């Protein structure tokens, strides 16, 4: 079975039924189901995610992208400081980077003030963190390969001259 194709299909549509996956892969349902279970067990598939346009709800969400400069620790590199950061519930996503900053965080809170308090009182005070740069998301156009639909798209296009 082409596991990469299976993973691509699931990544694109996690709700795709096993019968449809089997047909797309020209495999039996049993084989596809077993392969998915194996991929979940070995953590190749480590979760399923629903994309939500929070702007269409009455739930307040403020998303920030935070770049972090940190000093590596002897014998541990960045792993121990990363663990201190990623265990905060506000941290949605975290990457180790090559470039001007060591970490890139996606942080969520109810308001800009809540995110700022998190950065000021919990993140920036961690030993080894040298500097942070916080940017607030104003609008989301695309998330995980999917376009975020905008009801005002036509009106915005008409305004362009």
PLM segments and residue spans:
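A compositional/biophysical signature of low hydrophobicity enriched in polar/charged and small residues
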Residues: 1-161
């Amino acid at each position: 079975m082409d596991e990469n194709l299976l993973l691509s299909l699931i990544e694109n549509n996690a709700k795709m039924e096993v019968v449809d996956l089997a047909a797309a892969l020209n495999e039996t349902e049993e084989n596809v189901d077993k392969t998915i279970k194996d991929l979940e067990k070995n953590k190749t598939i480590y979760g399923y995610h629903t994309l939500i346009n929070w702007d269409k709800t009455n739930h307040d969400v403020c998303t920030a992208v935070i770049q972090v400069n940190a000093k590596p620790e002897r014998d541990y590199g960045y792993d121990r400081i990363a663990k201190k950061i990623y265990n905060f519930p506000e941290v949605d996503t975290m990457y180790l980077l090559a470039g001007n900053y060591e970490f890139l965080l996606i942080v969520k809170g109810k308001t800009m003030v809540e995110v700022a308090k998190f950065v000021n009182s919990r993140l920036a005070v961690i030993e080894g963190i040298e500097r942070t740069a916080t940017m607030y998301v104003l609008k989301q156009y695309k998330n995980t390969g999917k376009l975020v639909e905008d009801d005002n798209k036509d009106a915005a296009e008409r305004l362009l001259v």
